[in-house]
Amino acid sequence: MFPYPTLNYPPMAPINPMAYRDPNPPRQVAPFRPPLAAQIEDLRRSIANLTLKQRAPNPPAGPPAKRKKPAPSLSLETKKKRPPPPAKKQKRKPKPGKRQRMCMKLESDKTFPIMLNGQVNGYACVVGGRVFKPLHVEGRIDNEQLAAIKLKKASIYDLEYGDVPQCMKSDTLQYTSDKPPGFYNWHHGAVQYENNRFTVPRGVGGKGDSGRPILDNKGRVVAIVQGGVNEGSRTALSVVTWNQKGVTVKDTPEGSEPWSLATVMCVLANITFPCDQPPCMPCCYEKNPHETLTMLEQNYDSRAYDQLLDAAVKCNARRTRRDLDTHFTQYKLARPYIADCPNCGHSRCDSPIAIEEVRGDAHAGVIRIQTSAMFGLKRHGVDLAYMSFMNGKTQKSIKIDNLHVRTSAPCSLVSHHGYYILAQCPPGDTVTVGFHDGPNRHTCRLAHKVEFRPVGREKYRHPPEHGVELPCNRYTHKRADQGHYVEMHQPGLVGDHSLLSIHSAKVKITVPSGAQVKYYCKCPDVREGITSSDHTTTCTDVKQCRAYLIDNKKWVYNSGRLPRGEGDTFKGKLHVPFVPVKAKCIATLAPEPLVEHKHRTLILHLHPDHPTLLTTRSLGSDANPTRQWIERPTTVNFTVTGEGLEYTWGNHPPKRVWAQESGEGNPHGWPHVVVVYYYNRYPLTTIIGLCTCVAIIMVSCDHPCGSFSGLRNLCITPYKLAPNAQVPILLALLCCIKPTRADDTLQVLNYLWNNNQNFFWMQTLIPLAALIVCMRMLAALFCCGPAFLLVCGAWAAAYEHTAVMPNKVGIPYKALVERPGYAPVHLQIQLVNTRIIPSTNLEYITCKYKTKVPSPVVKCCGATQCTSKPHPDYQCQVFTGVYPFMWGGAYCFCDTENTQMSEAYVERSEECSIDHAKAYKVHTGTVQAMVNITYGSVTWRSADVYVNGETPAKIGDAKLIIGPLSSAWSPFDNKVVVYGHEVYNYDFPEYGTGKAGSFGDLQSRTSTSNDLYANTNLKLQRPQAGIVHTPFTQAPSGFERWKRDKGAPLNDVAPFGCSIALEPLRPENCAVGSIPISIDIPDAAFTRISETPTVSDLECKITECTYASDFGGIATLPTNPVKQETVQFIVHQVLQLLKRMTSPLLRAGSFTFHFSTANIHPAFKLQVCTSGITCKGDCKPPKDHIVDYPAQHTESFTSAISATAWSWLKVLVGGTSAFIVLGLIATAVVALVLFFHRH
């Protein structure tokens, strides 16, 4: 009523009326408080008044009472001697409630610790007959029976699992997929579930809690904790849950850490230490850069490398923003470098912004460029507004505004970080990156085709403003992303001639402060060494020495364009900032097609804005798929049958349509109208029928005329010999009657023996064959009859009703189950969905490969050799006679004695985590169905049933067995490929036999396993003189080639209207074959006839009817029940379906019901309680040619012929009237002939 609530303040004593009051007191304006805060404050005060204290009663009206003066003696004593303050009462720990205690007891009984070195490292829980143990938790389960179980590894979920012993299966926790938002229980209290994330207050839970279950109020497991990450005041948990189909799902927040108690150890100079606590704490990169890089290199393969890197980078840094601190400070361990660029705008050169790699695997034209310059970093720290590059031997920083990227036109910079640039570029064949440094301009161009990759089935060229969201690939800035690294190492030696000078006729090596220099001198003996201070050699010419500045305080990218350092060099790694991830992108939505319906014809008027894909398939046994790109406005026609047609236009969802038995004419009209009606429905059959009728009529007319004419001539021949002889009409008719005479059996056999002995023996063998057949039937009856009767008896005792229903979703099966002495019970079974779940075996995963080219080893004035390394498709080759230069200066003394060892191998690209294909072998599977059942008063009970003919399903008190399918069919071949959300039948090569340039050239069992196989035809080439690089040739990616030529998925070409789903791999709702059903209905569902309501004066009248339509029939049923109550209607025919099966009947009135039928003349028996009536009528064809639901159709021509058509047909070819007319015609013809002959 009011915009703000009235506050109820606590009662106060009334103001003394005799006290002095200002006649004009200032108005005190109460501070404004929002309505919600006011309500909360009001509620708090009310609760405080009611529960916390009892307020004193209000003083009576009048002057205030006099206050007593305090005694002075007491105040002095109080000042002198104060009592000690009372001891603070210790707060009692709140006891857990009943619900929490129950969950704690369940957890303690079903959760077992995992022991490692005498301490608890994590937990394993028993759920649903299996024991689950986190894979990252090492140790042994503290239970003898569970510890003896052989566990299977599921690395994708970071779990190990195994079946518990039979004696423990009854005492396990149950899981549930229902997770409504709210609070759940675990060992440390409450867990909040909101926005699909489990969170706890920060500081609750941590190392050692991995494997603990999260329970709901009923004690069911909703998740298993594996780790967590701090997010502000709360901690987000990394958990494993289950979806609605019982499939395990892993939910890991970004940056989560496993919560195993065991600390992963790292190593440095044979000393082990916790990876998150380096030994020289607070030893940081800023204090000891070389030692820090060495420590990281020695722990390159440690699974706690990220913790060590984080500790080394941030150990003395002040608190900053989390994303900036985690990401950008890592690259302070690296520096830019100068490398070879194939095209610097004029020719090949050594560029400070050389392009290492260009990746364009994201959608919407976004590319990622890796260069030799660095972005977002200055020489001494992080600054997003700057970029740094090598200006000769020194590092220089400039504003990022000087950077430019272009293809065929300038690109838009999206982000930059480390060595990487993220840009959105127009299509082009080359990528150019450059910057301006005052008057100097540095560019590098690389041949790379950039394309705008649209999402979905429409080839748009620019990101749309609005449309539909579809899955796509994007580059994102992920924090501490496991598995996406860029490989680094300490740079090799770089010659610096500025360090050499002539001093007192000798070559002097000048060492910068705090640096080391390695030198080679040949005068005439070769001398080499490392010095950290100025050094004078015995050489007299600068050309006789080479000086190399040792830079061991920074990493550089492990590039094939830089020489590798001498000796055994270790490698480091940093996180790739822009990693590909799955995301949602806006795709265009083509204008809806203008649809026109004709008889069994669908006409689509299409008006695409850009090339749009149109696919169609039939929903019958022959899919007959079509696939075409529509680039301009056009009109397409498709034939639609009763089996249905599915078409998909662009990014719109697929639509299914069915043809109705519509047509011109009327099956209940005159002959020409009936012919028009059937000609539209069955043109070929109608033409054949009409031709047959015409032929029968012509033969019927010609044959009697010719016969009568011949018989007349025979009859009047004797009279022609006598002149003026007249034949009476009656005699002429009697002459036409052919005389007959019957022979006995002996005469017939005698005739056959004398004239046709073959036919004689045939006639004799017929009785013998009949006798043999009868004897065989009697023998089979006595032998197999009792067993057959026993089987039938057992079947009848086990199941009340058996039938066969079509395997079509949405079309119900209806029947009437009768028992003697009981009223019939209506039974309805409807398939909600069907699933064929095959047994699959994942052979391997394939994806796009990435060629890794390490820095080459250049051996000056000597030879080197290759060693084998366990890398897929590893290639190594030594080239002699190389003469490399480094930024304009010679790298080696010798001219032809130098050697270079080039290496290259293949690894997974970063996109493999989101863009890969899985190769499966598919075997025979099981069929499951969800059915809705109605019997008697029990309505719509749903159940999941195995369609195998063996496994029963309980539905209420009824027992149902369905199956097996009449046709063991599956849309899958023996080998299928799953790519994204689509499935393809493809005969892929076996594991380990992939060929270069084809599907399977890169294979691994999982997306993270080390069993990588590759065959890419990688060949190393000889490097060019004067350039440090590693040229090679290689076959194009077979995975990318397969993606271009993969064809249409099974969702577009599978027959019988199958829909292909994943997790697990299965086809759904395939309308193939039929399903036997057997149901045992309990006795409680039947009603005795004496207790059944009675209805009298039944009369059924069909007022309107349209066959093959969705409840197109309307019938009226006048009723006069004994008493007003709800009764049930039962139809005895399967082809008639009632829309409503129960209805209240009044004392005197009528009931109108809708029904669906496929017959032209519906005639079905309708039973109301114990009374029955037959409903008959005529139905007209539907007016709608095409509908969006499956309609019922007659399957044979004879059942589709109306009674009117049969009547006209009988009249034409064989009715009684036809014989009468033909007899009259014959009589008239004979009479006319005799009359004209007489005269």
Curated annotation (Swiss-Prot):
Region (E1 fusion peptide loop): 882-899
Modified residues (Phosphothreonine): T111
Effect of S1109F: In strain: PE6 vaccine
Outcome, altering E528K: In strain: PE6 vaccine
Pfam families tied to this protein: Alpha_E1_glycop, Alpha_E2_glycop, Alpha_E3_glycop, Peptidase_S3
Modification comment: Structural polyprotein: Specific enzymatic cleavages in vivo yield mature proteins. Capsid protein is auto-cleaved during polyprotein translation, unmasking a signal peptide at the N-terminus of the precursor of E3/E2. The remaining polyprotein is then targeted to the host endoplasmic reticulum, where host signal peptidase cleaves it into pE2, 6K and E1 proteins. pE2 is further processed to mature E3 and E2 by host furin in trans-Golgi vesicle.
Site features described as Involved in dimerization of the capsid protein, chain residue numbers: Y184, N217
Outcome reported for the amino acid change (mutating R1044K): In strain: PE6 vaccine
One example of a Gene Ontology biological process annotation: symbiont-mediated suppression of host gene expression
Extracellular side: 260-681, 743-754, 798-1215
EC assignment: 3.4.21.90
Cytoplasmic side: 703-742, 776, 1237-1239
Residues spanned by motif Supraphysiological nuclear export signal: 43-50
Enzyme class, broadest EC rank: hydrolase
Further comment: Belongs to the New World alphaviruses that can cause fatal encephalitis. Structural polyprotein: Translated from a subgenomic RNA synthesized during togavirus replication.
Protein name: Structural polyprotein
